[in-house]
Amino acid sequence: MIQGFSHIGIGVRDLDASIRFYSEVFGFSEFYRLDFNDNEVAATMEQEGAFRSAMLLRGDVRIELLQWVDVPTSGGGKKPMTELGFTHLSFRVDEIDDLTEAVLAHGGAVHRQTLSYVGPEGSAQTGLLYYTDPDGTRIEVMTNVPQLSELRQ
């Protein structure tokens, strides 16, 4: 039985730069960092080779960043939302404008500079905007998102 959400893993080109991005833009803290040299952990990921890993924390949210050291990687850049599988991270935020400046200053990108508002009529509108991190992982930020306890009533 599922007890809760553990973490999400994100492949990155530069572990140190990605730690800075998620720490300085979104306020994550580095919990630990590990180096794996072609061992059983890499084998569980169906890949041989060395990689570096860092676990970042912010409240109950955990992000594991993975950088392959001696293995060619692919991807990077913005993936289409129509691609199957993982499409984006989404964070509830207090405010969006200051984040945009921080994302750009730390190597990320803003998509279309459009801020949309959605929600049922007569309720507070949820603002949302999409960014990407320096490796193209799409990140949605949302304001005025109801807490789960409010939705369950």
Which stretches of residues belong to each language-model region?
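Core segments of cupin and vicinal oxygen chelate
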Residues: 11-60, 105, 122
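Surface-exposed loop/turn and secondary-structure junction residues enriched for glycine/proline
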Residues: 8, 54, 118-121, 145
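Vicinal oxygen chelate
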Residues: 13-16, 59-61, 67-135
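Residue-level detector of high-confidence beta-strand sites
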Residues: 31-33, 113, 141
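N-terminal beta-strand motif that seeds the catalytic metal site of vicinal oxygen chelate
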Residues: 1-17, 34-36, 41-43, 86-91, ...
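Short N-terminal helix-initiation segments at or just after the protein's N-terminus
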Residues: 1-9, 26-41, 72-81, 107-108
